[in-house]
């Protein structure tokens, strides 16, 4: 219900597929050359999830292979889906990072409808880890509700129990708290009029983001509590993993 696509593409979100890969790789090369000797990372899931259509496009496989032997180019994407078997035998050379969006059972069941459940995503992540990819988990949006603290603690413990221990050093976390724009709220309520997703602005504070527009975010006290709940738990159960950020 909270998905970016519902507000970016209106009431009928769609997946945009680009078929001009050769041209895109040429553009990417121009950016890489400009930034050398720095390494340039390209994000493959900024506006849509590429995994559900990979069976038709093979875009991810071709992109992973393209960057596998590039000295200065890297690739990454994030998904909520689990059909990753076609990516397991590709020569990735550790140059592609694959991340999975995870959340508590309640969030996935109530507000993440139409996607594979938590355990299916974790099973897919295990396959990716065993295939040698750098991998990660994007926990988000982190939503506060009754007993949310315990649910997120249990989520971290479940992750720790499922990931192959030898791969934890290649694991990263991105922690993203729930936020919404006025446009997002309007669109969500139109598409999901019966939603119980908490969109009450009186419980939020207004904050301008990096792209120049504002969002309703959790107040500092709530943000601090989220940090206190998740960060120590990750450090305790997955000490070799890296926490990239909490926003």
Give the residues covered by each predicted segment:
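Auxiliary Fe-S-binding modules of radical SAM enzymes
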Residues: 160-247
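Short, electropositive alpha-helical surface patch
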Residues: 57, 98-101, 148-164, 191-200
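Distinct, well-ordered alpha-helical segments
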Residues: 55-58, 85-92, 148-156, 185-188
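Conserved C-terminal portion of the radical SAM core fold
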Residues: 121-182, 237
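Structured alpha-helical segments in the cores of large, soluble enzyme domains
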Residues: 27-34, 86-91, 118-131, 230
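Conserved radical SAM core fold
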Residues: 47-52, 82-85, 96-115, 141-146, ...
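Conserved Radical SAM active-site core
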Residues: 1-99
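Short, well-ordered coil/turn segments that N-cap beta-strands
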Residues: 36-40, 71-75, 93-96, 131-135, ...
